[in-house]
Amino acid sequence: MNTRVYGALDIGGTKIAGALIDRTGRLVARAQHATPAQGSAEDLMAAVFHVLDGLAAYPAWDGLTRLGVASAGPVDTVTGTVSPVNIPAWRAFPLVENVRAHPRVPAGIHPVLVGDAVAMAAAEHWAGAARGVENALCMVVSTGVGGGLILGGRLHAGTTGNAGHIGHITVDQNGPLCPCGARGCVERFAAGPAIAAHALESGWTPPPGTAPTAAAAATAARAGDPGARAAFDRAGKALAAAIAATAALVELDLVVIGGGVAQSGETLFGPLRRHLADHAVLDFTRDLTVAPAALALDAGLIGAAAAAGAAGPPPGALPAETALEGAHPRPAVAHPAETSMGT
């Protein structure tokens, strides 16, 4: 008998990742493909199918019982559609329907859609930095900026699955126009492409042969480049303003930040915490702890699996097999050797 596994997809503006995950949260297989973010809807779906094909090639696929799909948002978990701001070709795109139509997805499997940042929040609360925390904001800062909320010890996803979408809180009413249609969104200051663009505008020049990415800007900032440092300071200030506003609204105990840009460490967290001290000044928002995500770049995958498990028992499951093991102290996660920031 094949060991039961959950499948997971994590679709973002830079990459499409997939994994097979056992009931303890351990990744037993993985596949990945670059996101053709400016491609057609068909190009994008072909990339998703490429990842599914890669997972289906593993023997563990035969034990698939549930399939979770985390996507950049907005998403609509009621209709199974996605409209990622940083993937223009997908607007109200029927992602769940298309994933279910893949020939290797078993007939009884119904993909469960969740926003990528909500998935990250589910993962960090189940087995990461927010484990045991009653009220937390978990953020993904990468090609875009997203968030998920833990309120009263439970994941709060909202009616359509978009609660916590902090990347599109306005932090500057006269700020740059966002692809979402609003001005001054957090994402236009703190996402990887925005950081790289502002660093260039501030005088940073990447080394010859090096692409102008947030990762390259972080390296330059650590070396003291003023333009790169200014870009990360600007990002930290925008994130701090949004975090302080969220804390004032729902009273947070903890903020967890993951995603590619968060891999820059104190280059981002230093200015963020400094600006947060200026913005979060009320008694119940002051001294709010900001911590890096514990599950690194696998949080979206683990969260997608957790969402799939929470949706109900898999086909043919025994009573003890209806959910991931919440009592497991911490999943054994095989992290990829490489990390990448939103570009």
What residue ranges belong to the model's regions?
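Short glycine-rich, Thr/Ser-proximal phosphate-binding strand/loop in the N-terminal lobe
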Residues: 2-46, 62, 81-82, 161
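Short glycine-aspartate micro-motif
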Residues: 6-10, 63-68, 136-140, 146-148, ...
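Glycine-rich phosphate-binding loop plus the immediately following alpha-helix
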Residues: 16, 113, 117, 171-206
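Glycine-rich phosphate-binding/hydrolytic loop that grips phosphoryl groups
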Residues: 21, 112-125, 263, 267, ...
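Glycine-rich phosphate-binding loop and adjoining helix at the ATP-binding site
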Residues: 41, 45-49, 53, 62-67, ...
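Phosphate/pyrophosphate-binding loops at sites that engage ATP/ADP/AMP, CoA/4′-phosphopantetheine
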Residues: 48-67, 102-103, 129, 202-209, ...
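Glycine-rich phosphate-binding loop of actin/hexokinase-like ATP-binding domains
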Residues: 133-189
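A mobile "lid/hinge" subdomain adjacent to the ATP/sugar-phosphate binding pocket shared
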Residues: 186-256, 288-289
